[in-house]
Amino acid sequence: MKTDMRYRMLGRTGLMVSEIGLGAEWLERHSAEEVKAVVDRCEEAGINILDCWMPEPKVRSNIGAAIRGRRERWIIQGHLGATWQNGQYVRTREMKWVKEAFADLLARLETDYIDLGMLHFVDEVREFHQVMEGEFYAYAAELKAQGVIRHIGMSTHNPEVAALAAKSGKIEMLLFSVNPAFDMLPASEDMTEYFREDYGEGLGGIAPERAQLYSLCEQLGVGMTVMKGYAGGRLFSAESSPFKTALTPVQCIHYALTRPAVASILAGFDTPEHVDSAVAYETATEEEKDYASVLAKAPAHAYYGQCTYCGHCAPCPKGIDIAMVNKLCDLAKMQPEVPAALRAHYEGLSANGGDCISCKSCEERCPFGVPVSEKMREAHRLFEGAGR
């Protein structure tokens, strides 16, 4: 079947992946028939990579049924450490649960191998070392030696962890969060500089550690697949976007795919029509893809009071990663209910909004006037309430 889909090499794995992929998380709330409709439309469009991190049994079985008889057409990203315990998602490094959950993934997807075996959700440097130096990585290496997983990857939202993984020589590819809101920060202390008409040229406002990560991965042959490319839908609305101007799916996709090392953006699809709106990227004009001019023309006041996750507020005396807490809170507010993965991410932080002592030293450093201590209380109320 001829499609307009383009394919890219996923780093040194040797795998050619569609530049738009299926991030299957949204399928969790759908019936088997609805899941099959989305998967079928993806296949018709030339999509050949899917990520299934979710341990929930029903969605795994529904995806397995949808790809039945066509398994070899799909490159599957499956996760080690995402488990289902007492009716809910639990991220764990306890090997009993890890092994059971991975066996369940194979059974429900009706396959005897996973193309990309992901060390799931490693966001802190200390945890990275524990994972890589202990039985967790050893288990992944054993599965690879047996041919049960073909390549070892890691999912992380932290550029420092991602860089360590890339340099380790043991991680072949990364699943990493990429979008303009996560990447950009003020280019200078002078806010008017950031909103110059030619700001978008060269995108000088990307956080240095993230720009360095993309270049590092390109140099080392560590391919990237992208999660959170739409920032949970937040970027599609001028009201909810930190830029106060709306971006389209095509613009978000183009942003991700123009980062070095990125091979595929894994978008979430609720319906076949959502697939179509993403795949429209393949035939879009340069004007339709242009995100830089949209961001450059954002009103100069757009950021005021809005967290852009730039990190200028650090350091926090209690060790709170303020940008991460705000990011998780903003993503959670985009959903009718707080997703289990976001709640687990929040609970896994070494310090969270509940640890804020309202010293407000961060607020003095914030270039956008964000009421940080208030945001920390809001985040903690949101996630604590979701956990009950």
What are these regions (language model features)?
Residues 21-33, 80-99, 129, 237-246:
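Active-site mouth loops of central-metabolism enzymes
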Residues 104-127:
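Active-site groove signature of glycoside hydrolases
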Residues 122-324, 334-348, 374:
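Beta/alpha (TIM)-barrel catalytic core signal, keyed to glycine-rich beta->alpha loops juxtaposed to Asp/Glu
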